[in-house]
From Swiss-Prot:
Phylogenetic placement of the source organism: Eukaryota, Fungi, Dikarya, Ascomycota, Pezizomycotina
Domain of life, source organism: Eukaryota
GO cellular component: nucleus
Pfam families in UniProt: Zn_clus
The entry's keywords: DNA-binding, Metal-binding, Nucleus, Transcription, Transcription regulation, Zinc
Subcellular location, record wording: Nucleus
Induction: The fujikurins gene cluster is specifically expressed during rice infection.
Region (Disordered): 145-173
Name this protein carries in UniProt: Fujikurins biosynthesis cluster transcription factor FFUJ_12243
Length: 413
């Protein structure tokens, strides 16, 4: 008799039952397999047989969710935990230890005990209809939250987009203003450095290809371009009366005027350098030897004089362009305006100098003893500078004409 068909006592002792299997013939073979064991009879104990282990073949009526994906070959072990809980949950596959446990209850039907786990629905199966039923409330909630075309909050939802557009436009304007401010600052710095180089001793004679002359030409073009952008922005601001229009940064106006003043100072330095070389060429006979040495060192000759003429013509061209673009503060008669402390505007004639205007303004202020304080001195000086721009251009053109006349009358051609 095999070990699986032995009684519980013999199986625990790991021996085979000694039974008379011939009793009852072949028809009583099933009953004979559960006959009393000779070992139990000799020991005067009850012979208990456990239920047989059913095959691991799954039952057709078993729910799919009761089958576990674990491999029974890797999980089967001597313990009830490995054989019963984690074994493949086929119908009746509770493991031999569960069979031993069931054998202690003689009045329990084996078929019903082996099939209890296969018919028990621990987790009820869900059909697609039930899933759709559960998902329906969530869809209804999402539909209630989503706005419709007639929803009263549409205007509120569109307001952040308008704010984003305004912020992007303001950011773009600030970047453009910063870029123009940096360009104007660079123009002033380059003009100041070039003017200092021209005032140094031993500076070569200026030509149309000199770095200082090239910087004067390029920076003047850049300044006029920036000035046109500022005036166009101001005209656009005046045309639009809307409160959403972009405010003009007036700091750019003062920066442009400062760059204009530095370029005028550079023009004057170039004219002064040409005047020095012309004076060295027309010195008296007693300094002829020293003059020849200077001519040799500075390469002064007819070619240099021709370069002087071209440089002066270039300066005249640049000043005329400034007149057309920057000197628009003058009135219809072509004169600037001087604003006194009393608020009265008096015309500035071309014969009136800039320093005379400032000096008379300061004297007038000291005599009047105005109580407004020094906070108005800078704006008043700024107004004087603006009114003197046409006069500054005219006096610079007069200096250039004098130099051109001197070159024409000189003996070195």
């Amino acid at each position: 008799m095999s070990h699986r068909q032995s009684c519980d006592r013999c199986r625990q002792q790991k021996v085979r039952c000694l039974r008379d299997e011939s009793q009852g013939g072949a028809g009583n073979k099933a009953r004979a397999s559960f006959s009393r064991c000779e070992r139990c009879t000799k020991a005067s104990v009850d012979c208990v047989y456990s239920l047989k282990s059913r095959s691991n073949r799954p039952n057709a009526h078993q729910p799919i969710h009761n089958q576990v994906d674990a491999d029974p070959q890797t999980l089967v072990g001597p313990s009830w935990f490995g054989q019963g809980l984690f074994c493949q949950a086929a119908s009746g596959s509770l493991g031999p230890d569960y069979d031993d446990l069931a054998g202690q209850f003689a009045d329990l039907d084996g078929a019903e005990f082996n099939g209890w786990d296969g018919n028990l629905d621990v987790i009820p199966s869900l059909s697609m209809s039930s899933l759709n039923t559960l998902a329906a409330p969530a869809a209804m909630v999402s539909q209630d939250i989503s706005p419709t075309k007639d929803h009263h909050d549409n205007n509120h939802m569109q307001e952040p987009e308008a704010d984003d557009d305004d912020e992007s436009n303001n950011g773009h304007d600030q970047d453009a203003i910063q870029e123009l401010s940096l360009q104007l600052t660079a123009i002033s710095q380059r003009a100041t450095r070039a003017k200092r180089r021209l005032h140094r001793a031993g500076c070569p004679p200026p030509t149309v290809s000199s770095p200082e002359v090239n910087e004067a030409f390029e920076d003047t073009n850049n300044l006029l371009r920036i000035a046109n952008n500022i005036t166009n922005a101001c005209a656009h601001l005046c045309d639009e009366a809307s409160s959403n229009s972009i405010t003009l940064d007036y700091g750019l106006v003062f920066s442009a005027l400062a760059s204009h003043q530095h370029l005028l100072a550079l023009f004057k330095a170039i004219c002064h350098l040409i005047q020095r070389y012309l004076e060295s060429m027309t010195s008296a006979n007693q300094h002829r030897q020293q003059q020849q040495q200077r001519l040799h060192d500075g390469d002064i000759g007819p070619s240099s004089v021709a370069q002087f003429v071209m440089v002066l013509q270039l300066l005249t061209y640049l000043i005329n362009r400034m007149d057309r673009n920057l000197a628009q503060v003058n009135g219809p008669h072509g004169h600037g305006l001087e604003t006194s402390l009393g608020g009265q505007a008096t015309p500035i004639t071309p014969s009136t100098g800039y320093q005379d205007i400032v000096q008379s303004m300061l004297i007038h202020r000291g005599d009047k003893n105005n109580t407004t304080g020094s906070s108005q001195s800078l704006p008043i000086i700024g107004q004087v500078v603006l009114g003197a721009i046409p006069d500054e251009h005219k006096r610079l053109r007069q200096v250039i004409q004098e130099l051109q006349t001197r070159i024409e009358r000189s003996e070195i051609q």
